[in-house]
Amino acid sequence: MKPLEITVQAAGTAEELCSNIRSALSRGLPELALAPIKHDGNIVLVASGWSMPDYIDEIKAHRRAGRPIVAVKAAHDFLVENGVNPDLWINLDPRDRTNGIQRLNDHTVYMPASRCPPSTFDYLQGRKVLLWHSWAEGPEMTAIGGGKLAVGGGTTSGLRAVNIGYLLGFRNFTLYGYDSCNRADGVKRFTGDKAGVSIDVFVGGPTGRKFNCNMAMAQQANEFQKLFDVMGDITVDARGPGLIAEIMRVRNERKAA
């Protein structure tokens, strides 16, 4: 599929991000490191797309099967409210997103990136927190310093969660709420938030299925396709009727042809 020509503005200035990183490092938190984990190779990533609540029964079935459940940002509180305390919570965003983790619990390991704001770490005091660093070109790497594992990947928390899962040894990913598009009524998240400026995106060429996305969603869809260039041994089951699920459907169809 032809990549879109998109320009997006990343959140946070270089000065803000470096300040956040230095603040996080000063806290002496344990950091994400490569480690073997006992599992069956499957991991479940739950993001905040509008279709996610429709699949809560499937998510609960994964929990009963003993598969790790990862909440991406605001998906945390929905899962907790529905009886699924996530095993991990992952956030890359340098903006304060603590409004999505109001139902903190003692089971979840909270994994904010070092570029997240100090307010996030202050809020998580007393909880199980595992620090990780996101790779980025420029001064952020200087702020992180040498000898640190930095996780590369796309520009969203959801895509970095895939890379973290890969580093931890998982190869089979089930995705919920990775719609990366607006619902027909303009809703972009399960919380009912509406999208701003949007564009139409076609999967499989101009005669393919059309999706409406904001720029960040379209960029995420582009970056998602690059996962397979660097992690060719993964399998992805993207659940729901969204853009990323359609990309996977077309990809699998072409692969089988």
Annotate each language-model stretch with its function.
Residues 1-257:
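Metal-ion/cofactor- or nucleotide/acyl-coenzyme-handling active-site neighborhoods
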